[in-house]
């Protein structure tokens, strides 16, 4: 049997676990010493809290800040709790403003106060600017570290100015052009700067189309869509007065896309994407029990409707055997539509303008699948129980449930979005209740009428 080739991360984790299990803490600290902060963060998320407490003090203070911005919130809270106020300040004071803005809300007040005292006035103002916007908006996502020039200078002057700076912000692919009041006018691409003549004026080379600004209040989901559509590396951010307030870079957008993907998966079962995989048992139990309670309520709703047909079930035991088939088929069909529509809304591909067309299409798909699978299930039922009426009843119930499931799966995300409720979080449990109830009522109701 061929051996499975391990990834670099799996090898690093395996070696780290061996050292920790052998209580060889010095070796464990040495193994992660030369790793990138992102790799260290991933390893810390993959080990138990007690092992993190051993490893964390061995990581250089200058690296700890970079690691803190990469780990999820649960792990971040634990690591912050392991640090003194002085160490927290030293670890975070050199971070980019946007990264610092993400961490500050999770720091103790004493650490925040000390940190603000270490920042110069300009840095402090930039941090306050970002914190004034919602965390999930373009303003909360942006970095205030960018380069601006005036439109009435030459390329030669711009290049001279950049040389005086000696260092450019990370992911700088364009320089922003502003007037004296800091109103955004456009951008000057670095490629243009390097290829045009030195006496060319900036205003004649300003690019207004490729770098349309993003409003600071724009939701981060829409920001991610704009970056995808325009193939952006960075984008300017403006306020309601068209004044340049920051820029968003591709690394921030990658984080948004990753977080949204994790949220979509985790929220479907009531979990938080920032939950620590190795969180204490009672903490994890407390978080999950709420969702289990909600599921229990919906289960009893379905049981109530089944109870209405108790006499019918007593007359024919085969109904009880086949009930899960009807509910399961509707649940799967509805979930398929729910995910398609929820994802479409998140990416901006589904709106009120085209939802009617999509609902019609999903109902048609479920109708076709309903016909195909009702025939298959009807034949299996007839072969199993030799009962023609029972076969017809389950076939009709399957078609009914699949049609209702498709309509519900398409309509629910829209309705929940209108109510400001995350469809990825609440849609699944509501849909399951609908398909279970409709499936059971259709199947048992038809059975009561015809059998």
Where are these regions (language model features)?
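Alpha-helical transmembrane segments and their membrane-interface boundaries
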Residues: 152, 256, 262-407, 411-425, ...
């Amino acid at each position: 049997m061929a051996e499975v080739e391990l990834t670099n991360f799996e090898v690093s984790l395996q070696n780290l676990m061996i050292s920790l299990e052998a209580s060889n803490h010095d070796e464990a600290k040495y193994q992660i010493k030369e790793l990138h902060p992102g790799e260290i963060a991933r390893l810390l998320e993959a080990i138990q809290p007690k092992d993190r407490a051993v490893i964390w003090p061995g990581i250089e203070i200058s690296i700890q800040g970079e690691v803190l911005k990469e780990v999820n919130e649960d792990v971040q809270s634990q690591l912050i709790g392991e640090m003194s106020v002085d160490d927290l300040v030293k670890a975070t004071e050199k971070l980019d403003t946007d990264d610092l803005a993400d961490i500050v809300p999770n720091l103790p007040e004493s650490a925040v106060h000390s940190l603000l005292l270490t920042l110069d006035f300009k840095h402090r103002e930039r941090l306050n600017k970002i914190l004034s916007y919602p965390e999930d908006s373009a303003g909360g996502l942006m970095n205030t570290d960018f380069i601006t020039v005036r439109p009435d200078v030459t390329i030669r002057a711009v290049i001279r100015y950049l040389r005086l700076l000696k260092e450019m912000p990370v992911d700088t692919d364009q320089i922003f052009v502003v007037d004296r009041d800091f109103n955004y006018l456009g951008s000057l691409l670095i490629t243009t700067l390097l290829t045009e003549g030195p006496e060319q004026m900036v205003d004649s080379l300003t690019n207004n189309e490729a770098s349309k600004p993003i409003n600071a209040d724009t939701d981060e989901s829409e920001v991610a869509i704009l970056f995808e559509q325009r193939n952006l590396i960075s984008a300017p951010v403006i306020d309601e007065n068209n004044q340049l307030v920051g820029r968003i870079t591709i690394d921030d957008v990658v984080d948004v896309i990753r977080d949204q993907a994790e949220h979509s998966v985790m929220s479907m079962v009531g979990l938080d994407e920032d939950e620590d995989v190795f969180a204490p048992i009672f903490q994890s139990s407390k978080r999950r029990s709420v969702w289990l309670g909600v599921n229990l309520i919906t289960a009893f709703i379905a049981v109530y409707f089944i109870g209405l047909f108790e006499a019918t079930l007593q007359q024919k035991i085969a109904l009880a055997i086949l009930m899960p088939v009807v509910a399961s088929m509707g649940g799967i069909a509805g979930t398929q539509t729910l995910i398609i529509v929820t994802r479409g809304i998140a990416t901006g591909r589904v709106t009120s303008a085209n939802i009617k067309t999509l609902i019609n299409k999903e109902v048609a798909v479920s109708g076709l699948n309903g016909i195909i699978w009702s025939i298959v299930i009807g034949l299996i039922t007839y072969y199993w129980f030799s009962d023609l009426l029972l076969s017809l009843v389950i076939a009709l119930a399957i078609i009914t449930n699949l049609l209702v499931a498709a309509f519900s799966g398409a309509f629910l995300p829209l309705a929940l979005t209108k109510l400001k409720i995350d469809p990825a979080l609440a849609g699944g449990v509501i849909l399951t209740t609908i398909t279970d109830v409709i499936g059971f009522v259709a199947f048992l109701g038809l059975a009561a009428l015809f059998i």
